[in-house]
């Protein structure tokens, strides 16, 4: 892949040009070894290779034996990922990924590439962002091969297929497109391959970069694709006919296409009885609405609609605001911004310190602001409950969206009261109706209406009732299993018990 921008894209025309450029770097090493009246030149980046393997399994063989050609060296070295080539781009990519370059002085055209790369890996740990009490606990890591291994262990089928693409003219990052052959919709697959192939940028360092580059509408504050750290979640969406993207160096996978409801479901929902899982899903959706609308309703009612408040509650509000010199808008914005500052500070500081700052800071600032008559104690309770409700979102990115859209609602409530809240809600709904994920409607299965997919939306029906794959993914195989066989087995089980 040729670099863009100010980096010259025609400076490397031969192997000699490449070697001259690489030798400018202090960590690029070149060794020369005599063999049968000829010389063998070995070049590599010492920061990219495993030095122990290189000395024990490469240098030892080359120094102890005599060779007459590159093919002789190739046949002796005990490495599978080795090749003889004269392609400059292939040589460049290989050296920069931890290969060593071996040249034989009688062969000026070809060279041998041997993979002795060193990759630093961290151990597989528990999921921290999408933590579950019940169910699998492991999470992805930054190594692409490890992540693909975790998915294959969840779905050990030959129909699980992977395609790899390179993106980023400088980073040359590997992107793996994972799907199940025979279930995935070909149109979806070709569309995502097209989008990834058309990326023109110099670096892609994480899956979040990729999400922005392939989004249907990159200016939307609503996430159009879901990124997850859980292998079980990826396996589940692949079985539905969706697609997963992995970026080398990122501990998160991207699943697509996605609906808004997907951001309020968890893998733990499928480990519970369906009634309990449905209750928690409804609770999360209610918390989403509560978090967005509660503070704007407070501003609206205190600014325009006192008559809507019961007399006893109105007296309490008047007493709590009697010494506050600011209008409800300034009061609400002050507390909301304070909460956001505490969140951001807690997230950036070390875990224990951040937790302390969040708790102590919230208590101290809240108490001090009431005593200083900057805010009312009622609003502190409302803002605290709104913040708490936003934490129920199981996906971090949708939680950020909730935090942002609350502010336009507060301002519109101050300007137009309840009418402003209704207008802002209408504009938000209109925007969501136009939003797409991989050219699929974001509010599916409610718009367009598909009752067959309601079984796993705001509620979750029993798994035995979800024998069809979602229409949304347009999978080739609509049925997960034959429902008649399930019912037949139930009848046989009852008959066996009765006998």
From Swiss-Prot:
One of the Pfam families matching this protein, by short name: GerA
Primary residence: membrane
Taxonomy, superkingdom: Bacteria
Record-level GO cellular component terms: membrane
Spans through the membrane: 285-305, 376-396, 409-429
Localization (cell): Membrane
GO BP field: spore germination
InterPro entries reported for this sequence: Spore_Ger, UPF0353/GerABKA_families
Keywords carried by this UniProt record: Germination, Membrane, Transmembrane, Transmembrane helix
Protein's recorded name: Spore germination protein GerQA
Species of provenance: Bacillus cereus
Source organism phylogeny: Bacteria, Bacillati, Bacillota, Bacilli, Bacillales
